[in-house]
């Protein structure tokens, strides 16, 4: 018997995405215009990078919208998996962007390019405010939603890059050391890569139906086996339906009294304690001869 408990529906991130897309689009126009007027390749390159951020936000936003669509005959779990794929895309996009910045920075270390320090600093200061504001829009939802976490990291990474650009520009204006620009870019890129790698690992794990990192499968199995009337279990599977919803299915060898009361109690406990929204329990009066070996994921 399957029970669906949506005790904690995902937050409506529509307003956050609207503001973030609007702010980033405006900044791309500003930065691209400043780069074209000053002839700064650095600003033009960063404007192109921020344009990919807008694309990433639009994909994450679209996935969040799809996740709320009702189930259909063809998509019986709904389209929540789109949020996992969006998080995976964002992680890859961040890593690719960081790799491109690092490659360009390494090239410039051997042949530093003079940059218009004051103009770059002013544009970067605006970028700090815009990206920090965008990141804060997703801050509260990032812990419970990997899709929101991907958007948050995208914006936080850009804010960090803008901060590094300000420091580098200030240093160049004071010392005249043009190599500070690529050196700082490399340092920040490495820090961002570490965080993005964690997002990529988790998103890839979930996209392959892995048990969400915050759920202890062994502990749940132990808890189920200790319930009244349970003689054993097999085929325990836990997998993500989206970045915010999880499903569980298990066969229980059970010799209790009222099956409906037992199922209600167990499904409520799993929903409240572990946030597992959809639970399917198959009760068996004796061990099933066709039981498959439990697969730990």
Per-segment meaning from a language model:
Residues 20-30:
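The first (N-terminal) embedded transmembrane alpha-helix
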Residues 33-44:
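Short, hydrophobic transmembrane alpha-helix segments
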Residues 2-15, 19, 42, 48, ...:
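Alpha-helical transmembrane segments and adjacent TM-loop junctions that form the membrane-embedded core
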């Amino acid at each position: 018997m399957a029970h669906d408990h949506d005790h904690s529906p995902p937050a409506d991130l529509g307003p956050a995405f609207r503001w973030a897309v609007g702010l980033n689009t405006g900044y791309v126009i500003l930065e691209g215009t400043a780069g074209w007027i000053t002839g700064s390749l650095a600003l033009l390159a960063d404007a192109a990078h921020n344009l990919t951020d807008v694309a990433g936000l639009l994909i994450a936003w679209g996935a969040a919208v799809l996740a709320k669509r009702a189930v259909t005959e063809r998509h019986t779990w709904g389209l929540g998996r789109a949020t996992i794929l969006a998080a995976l895309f964002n992680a890859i996009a961040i890593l690719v962007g960081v790799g491109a910045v690092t490659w360009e920075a390494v090239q410039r270390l051997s042949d530093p390019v003079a940059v218009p320090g004051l103009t770059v600093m002013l544009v970067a200061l605006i970028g700090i405010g815009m990206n920090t504001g965008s990141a804060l829009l997703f801050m509260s939802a990032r812990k419970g939603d990997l899709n929101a976490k991907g958007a948050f990291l995208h914006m936080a990474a850009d804010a960090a890059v803008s901060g590094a650009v300000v420091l580098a520009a200030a240093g160049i204006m004071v010392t005249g050391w043009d190599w500070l620009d690529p050196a700082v870019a490399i340092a920040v890129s490495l820090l961002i890569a570490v965080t993005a790698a964690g997002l990529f690992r988790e998103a890839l794990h979930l996209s392959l139906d892995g048990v969400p990192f915050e759920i202890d499968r062994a502990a749940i199995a132990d808890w189920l086996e200790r319930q009244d009337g349970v003689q054993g279990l097999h085929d325990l599977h836990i997998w993500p339906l989206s970045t915010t919803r999880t499903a569980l299915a298990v066969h229980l060898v059970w010799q209790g009294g009222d099956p409906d009361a037992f199922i209600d109690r167990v499904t409520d406990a799993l929903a409240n304690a572990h946030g597992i929204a959809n639970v399917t329990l198959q009760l068996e009066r004796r061990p099933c001869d066709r039981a498959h070996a439990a697969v730990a994921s």
